[in-house]
């Protein structure tokens, strides 16, 4: 792969980024004859975008179970500051175990990006949808894999260039998957036509916070199983001593925000895990979307001096 200049992926990049909220009442930023009739997004979207003029790859981030997209704003701004447009839909407010509606909504939003997103961004910013990454955290990670696999009746015409699972979870335990089950328990069974995949795991995700609460990323349905079913190229990193929700914002408001500190086994603070996840995502995207693999190789070789956590496990399938 070729090289290009870049900053340390685990710190903020060179681009100033802003947050935008788009919903059915949002007005277009770019007033053109076509924009006047541009459709509103199917779901409320939180967008982190560079403000400098340019074309930028697009990354969709699907939130975890009963979480708000706003809880990921610090992570989104970190990744966006390296030259990416982040899109985080609010897929639901209340949901049962079935994820089919989320799969359907994600495919619909992906289709909307091609016709609607450009009209709602700052005039000087252009989304490059030929470089599109689909990512998700927890239940959102499962949803991202489900959409990419295209075997549940809903898919998008937008090509997925890379796929990222951030501590993905497919249920409460082996044999207790939430419908529709994504994991097949067959090694290398995810046929994604050589789409590059990044799977990030939390070292404490398999550990219950106390006897009253089950683990947030239980064995048998977590990042390990997702990676086992991947075909190459696929990368798997596990952060030691950090938990399933440690990549969220420091200040997550409301009852759901406060409960995010109480339900899972957590690390000492969120910033290191959030920076780790953001840096891995940036390094992976730079490698597979931009052709600059220097930081990803340094992380793989254990010689990146700025990794903010201890890497407990690392695997790669090429």
Swiss-Prot record:
PANTHER family in the cross-refs: CHLOROPHYLLASE-2, CHLOROPHYLLASE-2, CHLOROPLASTIC
GO BP terms: chlorophyll catabolic process
Highest taxon listed in the record's lineage: Eukaryota
Function: Catalyzes the hydrolysis of ester bond in chlorophyll to yield chlorophyllide and phytol. Does not seem to be required for chlorophyll degradation during senescence.
InterPro entries, A to Z: AB_hydrolase_fold, Chlorophyllase, Chlorophyllase-like
Residues forming the catalytic site: 138, 167, 244
Pathway: Porphyrin-containing compound metabolism; chlorophyll degradation
Subcellular compartments: Cytoplasm, Cytosol
One GO molecular-function entry: chlorophyllase activity
Protein family according to the UniProt entry: Belongs to the AB hydrolase superfamily. Lipase family.
Protein name, per record: Chlorophyllase-2
Secretion signal, residue range per the UniProt entry: none
Native source organism of the sequence: Arabidopsis thaliana
